[in-house]
A protein has these predicted regions:
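Substrate-recognition element of Asp-dependent hydrolases with the DxDx(T/V) motif
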Residues: 71, 75-108, 121-133
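Active-site neighborhood of HAD-like aspartate-dependent phosphohydrolases
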Residues: 6-84
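Active-site loop/turn elements of alpha/beta-hydrolase fold enzymes
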Residues: 55, 90-91, 185
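Gly/Ser/Thr-rich helix-start
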Residues: 49, 94, 98, 165
Length: 213
């Protein structure tokens, strides 16, 4: 069966050229944060944590990406605290031919544009583009988290935190010794960020290169 059409767009070739490895968008090696940062890494889920999840579907174009309430303020608070932030996301729509690598980059450029006015920034993005069972990185497996740690050799798992909305986001991080925090309709990312960073001093800390190619 070929890739199916989504909202009138032509499908890309499903899974063509995929290897079992995750996709990393960012510096080859992340620079460590300053001494003031409360965590080595803050790992953030995407759909349902930062942006509105599309029921039974995928964000396949920039205009479909809608921020959840509190998301921009939450990421901005983490940025001001000097945290290194890494987006950790399953995107099976790639394997199903619903968007290409370039299409995913365009979606994440839009995410950057939506976060920037509040002062938020992501330092890197790590993606599982695979179908279930085709890799070791699709959450709830821990490959995405291991990839993030490998790109930050100075980071210790016990000084990292994962924020997500689903048990599949949190369980692999906890298994590696990371702290976990769950967002929900009653507890948005801004509230979780205030818990993680009770006070923020000064202005935005100078950041790394960012993740956009």
């Amino acid at each position: 069966m070929g890739a199916r059409l989504v909202r009138g767009r032509r499908p890309v070739d499903a899974g063509v050229g995929l290897t079992p490895q995750p996709w990393w968008f960012g510096p080859q090696e992340l620079a460590p944060p300053g001494d003031e940062a409360p965590f080595d890494l803050v790992l953030l889920d995407r759909d349902g944590t930062i942006n509105v999840r599309i029921p039974d579907g995928y964000v396949t174009a920039p205009e479909e990406l809608l921020l959840l309430p509190g998301a921009a303020d939450g990421v901005a608070r983490l940025t001001r605290a000097g945290c290194r932030t890494v987006l950790v996301t399953n995107q099976r729509g790639v394997a199903r031919g619903l968007l290409s690598r370039e299409g995913l980059v365009a979606v994440h450029r839009q995410l950057d544009a939506l976060l920037a006015p509040a002062g938020g920034r992501l330092d890197a993005v790590v993606v599982c583009p695979h179908e279930q069972g085709a890799c070791r990185c699709r959450k709830p497996l821990d490959g995405l988290f291991r990839e993030a740690l490998s790109r930050a050799p100075w980071a210790r798992a016990e000084r990292c935190v994962m924020v997500g909305d689903m048990p599949s986001d949190l369980e692999p991080a906890a298994g590696l010794g990371m702290r976990t925090e769950q967002v929900s309709a009653a507890r948005d990312l801004a509230e979780v960020a205030r818990l993680l960073v009770p006070s923020v001093r000064g202005s935005v800390v100078q950041r790394g290169e960012g993740h956009v190619p």
